[in-house]
Amino acid sequence: TYQADLYENVTDDKYALIYSQSLNVTLKDEFQPYLYPNQYVWFTKDSKAVKKGQALSDDSADDLDYVQQVYHYVIENITYDKQKAETVASGYIPDPDATMESGTGICFDYASLMTALLRSQHIPTKLECPASWWSDMPAPPITPGSVYICTRSAGWITS
């Protein structure tokens, strides 16, 4: 089941819910939504993240080894940006390539980059971000930028 909500701009960056609908959807392949870019995990065939993902994949023995290489790449090459974390505005959208270029990021940047690296190499990866990242609603009880990965050998795992 999907939830589709339509919001109307009230003033500045404030929105009001004007329509909500639950949709029952049957997917031919349950993994398809977790293989493609979206606004939080943007990449194209020319992205730095895709090129880095390919390089890491070429050095991997299997999909689980690739996941480990991606994890180590991200934690060893991206430094946590405390100032950004303290000043990030509601509605922030991460950019995996910009995170790679700057070498810094917040939890959402780490998760978005990891998801882009994995999805670009056909590893189904789900990125969950709390509502607080994109609205003034309280955050649900999950870790900011939770990443769920599905591998052939281990099934769904959490980073």
Residues covered by each model-derived region:
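Secondary-structure boundary elements
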Residues: 35-102, 113-115
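Active-site-proximal helix/loop microenvironment
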Residues: 105
